[in-house]
Amino acid sequence: MVLDTGPLLAALDAADPDHPRCAALLTDAAEDLVVPALVLAELDYWCARRLSADAWLIFLDDVVAGAYRVESPTTIDLSRCRELQDRYRDLSLGLVDASIIALAERLGEPKVATLDQRHFRAVRPAHVAAFELMP
């Protein structure tokens, strides 16, 4: 499953209304939890704004311990991001969301964990008819 920033942030924030279902999704997942490298940067930013440095460091400890698999974008992924951002210009699809889509396509992964229903329901991935959005 490829992870967007929203579920990760909600899982770290006990006050977030989506915390219970996002924390359960990450805790109970049987499959690999894949985090695009650009999501790491966005999560660091939002932890600093909404939570604390401790929240980010706890998450980073989990990454280092192997709870998550981090994937950097390839040149081909970035080319696909450019295609997606051009095609879905009316959605204002950002680079982070485009990189999640490109990575899911590259890995052949149908599941995306996101709280961003708008973008991920509108985009038609190349490898499946539609993403299976979690939670």
Residue positions per predicted region:
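Active-site neighborhoods of divalent-metal-dependent phosphate/nucleic-acid chemistry enzymes
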Residues: R69-L115
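Alpha-helix/helix-capping structural signal
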Residues: G6-P7, L38, I76, R118
